[in-house]
Amino acid sequence: MAEPVIGLAAGVHRPRNVDWKRAAALLYGDWGTSKAYVIGLAFVAAGFSSFPIILAVCALTAVVGYNYIIICSHFPDGGGVYSAARKQSRFLASAGALLLVANFIVTAALSGWAAVSYLGVSSENARLATAGLILVVGIINYFGPRHSGSVSIWLAVPAVLVVILIVAFSGAHLKIAELEPAHSSFTVTWIQFVGVILALSGVEAVANITGVMKLDPDSSPDRPKVTRTATKAIVPVAIEVVFGTVLLGWAMLSLPKFFGPQLADHKEDMLRFLAEHYGGVAIAPWFGTAFGIAVGIVFGLLLFSAVNTAVVALIGVVFMMAQDGEMPRQLARLNRHGVPQLPLLAAIALPILVLALTSDFNALAGLYAVGVVGAIAVNLGSCSFNRELALGWFQRFIMGSTFLVLFAVEVTIAKTKPDALFFACSVLGIGLTLRFYSHKLSGLTTLTVTRKVADMVVPNLPITMQPRLEEGQKIMVAARGINPVLNFALEEAQLRKAVLCVVYVKEVVVYFAGSPNVRGRPRWQEDPEANAIMSLMLKEGQQRGVCVLPVFAVSEDAAATIVDLSATMGVDCLVIGTTQRGALTNLLRGNVATHIAENLPDTIRLVIFG
């Protein structure tokens, strides 16, 4: 009688299929949208004397972009704030991740408000329309759409083109004489500068996707390197963001002074206003109106994509922390589509709550900077003080200097914007309380030991048990739940004296904001549904004399994983059941059986049991 075999987890790695063009488009969907509202907020902060502030913010943005090229080169598996700060301290990493959570909450609300404004919704109805938009995003994400940034990718080129057209139409009307110097003291100018720091928002996105970027030609999966890919993705986007913001700001400030009230009223959709005005002046009034509508649609959809990105990233950060033991494990529970339930609810409810508690767009923008600046500062500070990173003295100096500037900005925000300070403290307080509760439940404590003792504690323990398989055919069965297809597979394996590989793929459709520190390989014993299936099959296999090999995988694409495992394990026959998904789920996620049939190698027979 064959002995039942308890299989080890099958590790599934995300493919590195994001080239520099796709990475640049994804980055532009986050970073490139900042100009849609930054220049309007600059005018509200300093009026016609805001050009020096815009120049200073763009200069800082360029320096931060250079810093993130360095970060991406040293963190090819994910260089977000959580991954970078974790090398210094788990507590610091959690604090940085919570600041990122605060950033994503306000990003969803602010980008949604700007999106509906660009699409023509009035200021009076913008709050309600934004809440509805966020709810729609939540409903879509309940079914777990992949985080591909498809809208950003398709709209990146049109967005760049309309920016170039606005600058071209305004070129003949740019005036140096209309630019006013700063009228206030350094302290007042610094506070105004801090209020326009939102141009940095989105740059963190590139560090979070290094784990799926294509490797450089001179690297390998064992020694990954994405310096070239990251550089080619960051540089063009940084150039467009910096020069686009400067030129659009110059175009805004070149308008006559009597346009001041109109500029203040259009702070949420400044690019649409500039497109209407300069398009009408350059060609004809009807063209200006049409061009303004086109700009509104392009940037409205791009900002809608930014809302979706923020929601998905917020879910991913909370899920990653829960998987890593920094949040209660209940936050990692998934719905039937592989999406974390409680993080999804929080990602929808919290931005709507912030919308309800803020008075207007300016108040919302005031909450924004505290999260994004704090997260970037923690990331740069952790890297600049990390002696294990092979940084040159110039790189470390630039990174440390940028950290000091951002730290000063964060302190200024805390001093001058009490609402932002209260918001950040609330997110940090609630998050760290949940972290303490999670550690208490799991029995984790913090100990201080010598380096010699710490070096002896390594996660790579020797493997003491290896599966023993019978020679002969291999049959693989993939099923969701206990159903007749499992009995059919057992009968086939018993008849053919074959090894039966029982595959359970746990779908986790979550965008990981960074690369978490995995605490051991995934085990089917820890998943209730997989445990029920595998235990039953091991018992039945032992009674029938069938060698059963459990195979457990965690993946965002069940069909691709099943096909990959079938080919890798060299099975002769794959048995699957008919799809149990509804029509709406098939529309959003696709049919698993169809995907398997289209991609399975011809040498493997496919049996669909219905």
Regions found by a protein language model. Name each.
Residues 1-38, 83-85, 91-94, 189-193:
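Membrane-interface "cap" regions at the ends of multi-pass membrane proteins
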Residues 218-223, 232-274:
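Extracellular/periplasmic helix-exit of transmembrane alpha-helices
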Residues 153-208, 415:
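Helix-loop-helix junctions that connect adjacent transmembrane segments
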Residues 151, 330-341, 376-418:
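C-terminal membrane-solvent junction of multi-pass transporters and transport-like membrane proteins
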Residues 124, 157-182, 249-257, 379-392, ...:
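Hydrophobic alpha-helical segments and their helix-loop junctions in multi-pass secondary transporters
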Residues 467-527, 540-542, 549-551:
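Small/aliphatic-rich secondary-structure junction motif
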Residues 39-97, 106-133, 238-246:
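Extracellular loop-to-transmembrane helix junctions
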Residues 90-93, 127-131, 214-244, 319-356, ...:
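Loop-to-transmembrane helix boundary motifs in multi-pass membrane proteins
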